[in-house]
From Swiss-Prot:
One of its GO terms (biological process) is DNA-templated transcription. The N-terminal domain is essential for RNAP assembly and basal transcription, whereas the C-terminal domain is involved in interaction with transcriptional regulators and with upstream promoter elements. Gene3D superfamilies: 5' to 3' exonuclease, C-terminal subdomain, DNA-directed RNA polymerase, insert domain, RNA polymerase, RBP11-like subunit. This is DNA-directed RNA polymerase subunit alpha. Residues 1-229 are annotated as: Alpha N-terminal domain (alpha-NTD).
Length: 314
């Protein structure tokens, strides 16, 4: 057990809002800033449950490459707009809901035009959905589900309505997380850490709520190590087929789930690299040509991919 004469660290919410929060924990023994900040960041980005649009039914539309008479946007554009919809379930036990929209032109259709429901709250009612011209009509049924992480359309394949179009879903309500570790002092001691966590969310959960959930998830998993009988349990065998299926699913993960630093993530996204599959399509020469990607960044990418069982092409 770590011997320390420090009093309990003080947790402070220096900034707290619906979409952004900044939290400080200090003082910590040297090294514990990174020890706590890194896993919390990864959990916040990958494991906080949220809601997302999973399928869309549009009257008289058979597939996503259709156009709608009297509607400026095509179906692909409408679906892209709907993917930005932020919905909060007011009942924590609710697993899914269907939002209904009826509109006639001329009109700019926004998220606030969905039929009101006592069970849900639309957090971005000004979100643009479509533009209807004179005589244009639009009827939609949009299914919203609760989930975790990223689920491609072909995996959840929701078809609870004939001609419903499945949609790729990013459930995470956490948009971005950054942490910083600085030196701090207490009395004569100057070898202490100050951890600052900055969290951005979509507003369906507050940054503090997301942080509390991440802490609970981390505690739950650390408790597995405290069970002395756990090591006596037989390790389940995983078939080759299950391994292949798991690897295929990992290919479709968004880059955020690799736990890369914000700087590296930004450099890759600037080049249009959004998924593990897209990253693995590049070789080392390709990556070195990306602005902001040096040898240290390459090593970070290698290690992140190795944790998923992947290696970069030479």
């Amino acid at each position: 057990m770590l011997e320390s004469k420090l009093k309990a660290p003080v947790f402070t919410a220096t900034t707290q809002g619906d979409h952004y929060g900044e939290f400080v924990l200090e003082p910590l023994e040297r090294g514990f800033g990174v020890t706590l900040g890194n896993p919390l960041r990864r959990i916040l980005l990958s494991s906080i449950p949220g809601t997302a649009v999973t399928s869309v039914y549009i009257e008289d539309v058979l597939h996503e490459f259709s156009t709608i008479p009297g509607v400026k946007e095509d179906v692909v554009e409408i679906i892209l707009n709907l993917k930005e919809l932020v919905v909060r379930f007011l009942d924590p036990k609710m697993a899914s809901t269907t939002l209904i929209l009826r509109a006639e032109g001329p009109k700019e259709v926004r998220a606030g035009d969905f039929t009101p429901s006592a069970d849900v709250e639309i957090m971005n009612p000004d979100l643009h959905i479509a533009t209807l011209e004179e005589g244009g009509k639009l009827y939609m049924e949009v299914r919203v589900d609760r989930g975790v992480g990223y689920v491609p359309a072909e995996r959840h394949g929701i078809k609870d309505r004939i001609n419903a179009i499945p949609v790729d879903a990013i459930f995470s309500p956490v948009r971005r997380v950054a942490f910083q570790v600085e030196d701090t002092r207490l009395g004569q001691r100057t070898d202490l850490d100050k951890l600052t966590l900055r969290i951005w969310t979509d507003g369906s959960v507050t940054p503090l709520e997301a942080l509390n959930q991440a802490v609970a998830i981390l505690k739950e998993h650390l408790n597995y190590f405290a069970n002395p009988e756990a090591s006596l349990l037989p390790t389940p065998e995983v078939s080759k087929g299950e391994k292949r299926e798991s690897a295929e699913e990992d290919l479709d993960l968004p880059l955020e789930e690799l736990g890369l630093s914000t700087r590296v993530l930004h450099s890759l996204k600037e080049e249009g690299i959004e998924s593990v599959r897209a990253l693995l399509a590049l070789n080392l020469k390709d990556l070195r040509n990306i602005p902001g990607i040096g040898e240290r960044s390459l090593e970070e990418i290698r290690q992140a991919l190795a944790k998923k069982g992947f290696t970069l092409k030479e």
